[in-house]
From Swiss-Prot:
Optimum pH is 7.5. It comes from Escherichia coli (strain K12). The lineage of its organism: Bacteria, Pseudomonadati, Pseudomonadota, Gammaproteobacteria, Enterobacterales. Its EC number is 2.7.7.65. GO terms for biological process: cell adhesion involved in single-species biofilm formation; negative regulation of bacterial-type flagellum assembly; negative regulation of bacterial-type flagellum-dependent cell motility; positive regulation of single-species biofilm formation on inanimate substrate. Mg(2+) binds at residues 165-166, 208. Homodimer. Pfam families: CZB, GGDEF. The gene is dgcZ. Changing residue 52 to A: Decreases zinc affinity by one order of magnitude. Its cofactor is Mg(2+). This is Diguanylate cyclase DgcZ. Allosterically regulated by zinc, which seems to regulate the activity of the catalytic GGDEF domains by impeding their mobility and thus preventing productive encounter of the two GTP substrates. Subject to product inhibition by c-di-GMP at a KI of 44 uM. Keywords: Allosteric enzyme, GTP-binding, Magnesium, Metal-binding, Nucleotide-binding, Transferase. Zn(2+) binds at residues 22, 52, 79, 83.
Length: 296
């Protein structure tokens, strides 16, 4: 599951707070060394990494996708290692048996932790930079880069691509202006994200087109999902500064078969959607393996 921009921003904020919290931890450690005080559990406990703010936060971080998981695991491991090295150094100083190796290990632990944080930040910022600015949804590039992975890991379900286009969107812009048109796009993006399941992702593909990656057991279930989305759009007016707008969408749904390139799947879904536009709009069309298109 690809994170929303608000989720990415919240994680980045917590990563920055982690640095600040561990500066405070270092000061507390220096104070304990000077005072010869080995009683603080956040420093000397064998599981001190789980007592700090960052340790508690990372334990509740999720859900994580397969690409993100290695970064978080490395960060968690480096965090534990840093705390362990800090504890061993402090106790060695307090008990007056420290060696240069204790300082070297702690320095390495600090550097490894900050490097792991930086790598995770870069990963998140890369995703963030490919988000659509207007809607906050992942954009076309994110879909291009993640589709093959999603297709390989869809089992035991099948992967379907739903291409949606707002009906007569040019008329909305011509009638109300582009600022209201932007409100329509942003609001629809929010609606679509809230109407899909956690493991399904909505993308802004371009203009007034959106793509939803749907996981379903069979064609019938995928078609029901498509019809449900179209009906929900039809039944939810969009509020703007001057009142309300009712919009509809036309959708084309196609199954993605193993090893199929994204452009092939989109091409099929686009043909189905175009057929829906030509036959009345505000409907969901399904294209099967034989390229037969039917309204669902």
């Amino acid at each position: 599951m690809i994170k929303k921009t608000t989720e990415i921003d919240a994680i980045l904020l917590n990563l920055n707070k982690a640095i600040d919290a561990h500066y405070q931890w270092l000061v507390s450690m220096f104070h304990s060394v000077v005072a010869r005080d080995a009683s603080k559990p956040e420093i000397t406990d064998n599981h001190s990494y789980g007592l700090c703010q960052f340790g508690r936060w990372i334990d509740h971080l999720g859900p994580l996708d397969n690409d993100e998981l290695p970064y978080v695991r490395l960060m968690d491991s480096a965090h534990q290692h840093m705390h362990n090295c800090g504890r061993e150094l402090m106790l060695a100083i307090v008990e007056n048996h420290w060696q240069d190796a204790h300082f070297d290990a702690f320095q390495e632990g600090l550097l490894s932790f900050t490097a792991a944080l930086t790598d995770y930040k870069i990963y998140l910022l890369t995703i963030r930079s490919n988000m659509d600015v207007l809607t906050g949804l992942p954009g076309r590039r994110v879909l291009d880069e993640s589709f093959d992975h999603q297709l390989r890991n869809a089992e035991p379900l099948n992967l379907y691509l739903m291409l949606l286009d707002i009906d007569r969107f040019k008329l909305v812009n011509d009638t109300y202006g582009h600022l209201i048109g932007d409100v329509v796009l942003r609001t629809l993006a929010t609606y679509l994200a809230s109407w899909t399941r956690d493991y399904e992702t909505v993308y802004r593909y371009g203009g007034e087109e959106f793509i939803i990656i749907v996981k379903a057991a069979n064609d019938e279930e995928a078609c029901r999902a498509g019809v449900r989305i179209c009906q929900l759009v039809d039944n939810h007016a969009i509020t703007h500064s001057e009142g309300h707008i009712n919009i509809t969408v036309t959708a084309g749904v196609s199954r993605a078969f193993p090893e199929e390139p994204l452009d092939v799947v989109i091409g099929r879904a686009d043909r189905a959607m175009y057929e829906g536009k030509q036959t009345g709009r505000n409907r969901c069309m399904f294209i099967d393996e034989q390229n037969v298109i039917n309204r669902v």
